[in-house]
Amino acid sequence: MIENILKNNNLKVTNQRIKILNIINELGCNSTLKNIINNSNGVDTSTIYRTIKTLEDRNIIEEISGINDDVIYVISDSNKHY
């Protein structure tokens, strides 16, 4: 599923992108930046920021407002069917 999302959006499939998308998918409504970083197991923080920016720019993920104005990242509806 995750690899297809990247391929269908003309992005190179990398371990970091797969890992971050899997984390977002698994955490669901708890996928704040802090939780993504805490669950990334060794992925450099700057890589996480760049990857999230790339995924947002390609509309693969989107931001939603959570409790206490936390930003939560979710996989965009247009990519959930992969």
Can you say where each PLM-predicted feature lies in the sequence?
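Short alpha-helical segments that sit at the start of domains
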Residues: 1-21
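Short helix-capping/hinge SLiMs at alpha-helix to coil transitions
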Residues: 11, 25-28
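Conserved beta-strand edge residues that scaffold enzyme active sites
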Residues: 20, 38, 68-70
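Short acidic, hydrophobic short linear motifs in intrinsically disordered regions
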Residues: 30-39
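Basic amphipathic alpha-helical segments that dock to polyanions
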Residues: 48, 52-58
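Non-DNA-binding regulatory cores of transcription-related proteins
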Residues: 57-82
